[in-house]
């Protein structure tokens, strides 16, 4: 079996998540996002970082991510023909809440040519909150106002005939009107709402989000207390978060929009008391507390050129 170095090419030791993925995907043709030296005879000494789990990483993010890439697509990766767009964002203090749902509940929300993605014969719905910061157009143009906001989204998990894994958004709430209008014009169903991050105090510092839609159309309040000593390394947690694109319908056509970033620094977390009407408003019924609660300090992202999904 080919061996991948546990040190990144910038000299730093690989993170526990990267090491776990290296263990799970040690074969050379399924190289994970650990920039190392491949000992495969055909590629001996070639420094690589593949899209097997984390999707293609554009060269212009290489210095930020501390890694290089051969931009191949893999089992959970994005489109091998990934073409980066000059749009970058940072996603910070990400709280992931997930519930297991029947596959039949997700089917009606899939665009043509897209089907629910499954993990152990089940699919999931997610309620995710995070802060968007440092939005840039091109290498130098920052958007300090329009590009800084709070987002809360409800999403399902999808896969198309080309094997691209992604998400289908049922709703996205954000507190920056300019961004909402631009995103809706691109076919992404953003809603302008009152959104804000909250900090919870207890035995540890927690992170949460509050959303209130205008005209009383729904609200949500949720959060999590992360355990920063326990990285989330299980297969389900990686499957839920290693999503590097979204499927969306624009008019009569369906597109896959790739999004590239380095591996999530992902941690187990405990849910705080929460009240949510957004998942129900999106048409999905869940019962009880979430089945999975995760937290990430965040990642730097770059959007790619949309690809049409052929049904």
What are these model-predicted stretches?
Residues 14-15, 33-35, 48-51, 59:
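Ala/Thr-enriched low-complexity intrinsically disordered regions
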């Amino acid at each position: 079996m080919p061996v991948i170095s546990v040190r990144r090419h910038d000299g730093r030791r690989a993170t526990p998540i990267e090491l776990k993925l290296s263990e799970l995907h040690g074969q050379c043709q399924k190289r994970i996002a650990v920039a190392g030296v491949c000992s495969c005879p055909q590629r001996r000494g070639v420094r690589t970082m593949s899209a097997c789990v984390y999707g293609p990483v554009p060269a212009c993010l290489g210095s930020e991510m501390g890694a290089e890439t051969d931009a191949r697509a893999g089992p959970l990766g994005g489109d091998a023909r990934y073409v980066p767009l000059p749009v970058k964002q940072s996603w910070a203090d990400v709280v992931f809440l997930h519930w297991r749902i029947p596959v039949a509940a997700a089917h009606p929300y899939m665009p043509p040519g897209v089907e629910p993605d499954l993990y152990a014969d089940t699919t999931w719905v997610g309620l995710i909150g995070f802060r968007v910061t440092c939005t840039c157009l091109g290498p130098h143009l920052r958007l300090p106002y329009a590009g800084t906001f709070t987002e809360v989204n409800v999403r399902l998990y999808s896969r198309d005939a080309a094997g691209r894994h992604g998400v289908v958004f049922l709703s996205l709430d954000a507190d920056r009107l300019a961004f909402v209008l631009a995103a809706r014009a691109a076919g992404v169903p953003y809603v302008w709402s009152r959104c804000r991050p909250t900090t919870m105090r207890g035995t540890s510092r927690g992170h949460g989000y509050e959303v209130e839609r205008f005209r009383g159309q729904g609200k949500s309040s949720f959060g999590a207390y992360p355990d920063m000593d326990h990285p989330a390394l299980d297969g389900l947690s990686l499957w839920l978060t290693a999503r590097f694109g979204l499927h969306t319908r624009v008019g009569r056509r369906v597109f896959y929009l790739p999004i590239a970033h380095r591996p999530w620094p992902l941690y187990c977390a405990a849910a705080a008391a929460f009240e949510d009407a957004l998942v129900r408003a999106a048409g999905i019924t869940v019962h009880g507390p979430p089945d999975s609660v995760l937290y990430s300090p965040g990642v730097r992202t770059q959007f790619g050129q949309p690809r049409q999904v052929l049904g």
